[in-house]
Amino acid sequence: MLRAWQDVIVKWRLVPDDLPGNDPEGAQHADLARSALLDGRLDDALTEFGHATRLRDHPLDQVGIGDVHLARGRWDEADERYQRALAAGGAAALLARLGITQVLIGEGRAAGAIADLEHLVADRPHDPTLRYYLASAWYSVAEQSRSRTADDTLVITSEQQLLICEQAAERILTLKTGDDELDRGAEHLLNEVAMGRRWTWAPEGIAVSLAVLTVAFGLITVVAGGLMGSALVVIAGVVVGAGLLFAIVWRFRRQTWRRRADEMASEITRKGV
């Protein structure tokens, strides 16, 4: 699934309004199709792009038909149209490449789209449209990497997922797309990562009680050894108390993300990376 409807259509900003053409009627149908697509009227867009393809052979029409299929989740049909446009080259090739990356994202393979988008942004670092697509892809990577419950709650269940979310959020913010939704999402991801790395006791009540008892045992043993004048008892109290305290910390002190992952384990329906 794509992150947002605009991921289908934003790439059309890259098309100049004064593209040359030798078939006025075909161009007219293409303009109507593009307008319908941008308005979300997919049936009208498909009809008009179809008329255009019967009157002319233009790769942008293939991109447009691919976008209709993309919006409807027909990944194979969309990819076929984008590949045709890519093979034709010209101004449509860039849009076709972007379309192919969106197919990968829609198929749940967002990580596979990152390399090509990073190359595009490296070639044109000041292009806001390309930066937007890269940021959106990174957000999809973060979504697809996490585990998911039946009600579509995303849960970090591995250290790798934690690192991916952090990397994605930082990259989104450095791209400075100006998209409020993406920026808020990235900031939320960073907060989730920070919260996930916090240490906590699990289960808290038992851990705290055992820690208190262990410290008390150590103090009592040391005091008793001192009153008895036995250095051996004092040393034993210190060593045993320290060992027990270490064991409690090792057993019960966990990062928040691990604790939540354990709590949600029975509800996970799709595991992440």
Predicted features, each with a name:
Residues M1-V15, C165-I172, L182, T269:
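Generic low-polarity alpha-helical segments
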Residues V8, V15, A78, V141, ...:
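Enriched - but not universal
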Residues I9, V193, R197, I268-G272:
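Short, flexible helical or helix-coil boundary motifs
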Residues P20-R197:
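Membrane-protein extramembrane domains
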